[in-house]
């Protein structure tokens, strides 16, 4: 989702909500601009007033300077911080395109197909419709709507090969944004690095199976 909340604490809480909702293993965080402050906030105890839940700290897994901020020695190391340079962003763009070409990224179906073939068999979703609970109904439909928005966003982006460095620059056209593209491409970049790490440590095992 594209989140324009200015408050870094609220952004951190929203990230924790999604982390819990999807039972995620990792958080990939763009640390440019306000991202570093969000990272520091995620490394502290957070209280979610909306859900009445207290979240324990999480810890940066790939940057010792960031990790030092976390005061909890038992915090789970699961935040992958990216401080993207022009070259890193170029590598991420090339990597993401390759993943798409090789069909290594499976997108959700569009919302209309989801309603007919997936959500129609979900009793909670049908109850939300019958009781006119639009909030819960949207919660079920949102992942599919956000996927459509991601695909549309990517289609509108402009790509330029810089003549001096050969790096690929990705930028918005007009009032369009690239928040969803950044989230998805950074996530794909991290997963590829994780897969390489797993392959690199496979000497201790007879074989390793990787499933995308």
Protein language model regions, located:
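Mg2+-dependent endonuclease catalytic cores in nucleic-acid-processing enzymes, primarily RNase H-like
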Residues: 1-161
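Generic macromolecular interface patches on structured domains
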Residues: 25, 106, 164, 193-200
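Generic alpha-helix initiation/capping and coil-helix boundary signal
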Residues: 147-148, 176, 180
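Short, solvent-exposed helix-loop connector elements
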Residues: 163-175
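Acidic two-metal-ion nuclease catalytic site recognized across multiple nuclease folds
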Residues: 178-181, 185-212
């Amino acid at each position: 989702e594209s989140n324009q909340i200015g408050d870094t604490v609220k952004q951190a809480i929203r990230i924790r909500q999604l982390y819990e909702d999807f039972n995620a293993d990792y958080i990939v965080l763009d640390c440019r601009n306000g991202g570093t402050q969000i990272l520091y906030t995620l490394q502290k105890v957070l209280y979610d007033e909306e859900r009445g839940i207290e979240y324990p700290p999480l810890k940066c897994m790939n940057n010792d300077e960031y990790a030092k901020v976390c005061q909890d020695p038992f915090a789970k190391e699961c935040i992958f911080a990216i401080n993207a340079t022009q070259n890193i962003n170029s590598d991420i763009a090339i990597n993401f395109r390759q993943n798409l070409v090789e069909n290594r990224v499976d997108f959700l179906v569009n919302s209309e197909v989801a309603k007919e073939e997936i959500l129609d068999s979900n009793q909670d979703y049908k109850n939300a419709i019958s009781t006119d609970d639009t909030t819960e109904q949207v919660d079920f439909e949102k992942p599919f709507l956000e996927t459509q928005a991601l695909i549309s966003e990517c289609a509108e982006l402009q790509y330029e090969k810089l003549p001096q460095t050969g790096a690929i620059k990705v930028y918005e056209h007009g009032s369009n944004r690239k928040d969803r593209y950044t989230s998805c491409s950074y996530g794909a970049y991290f997963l590829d690095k994780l897969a390489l790490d797993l392959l690199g440590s496979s000497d201790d095992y007879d074989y390793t199976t990787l499933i995308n």
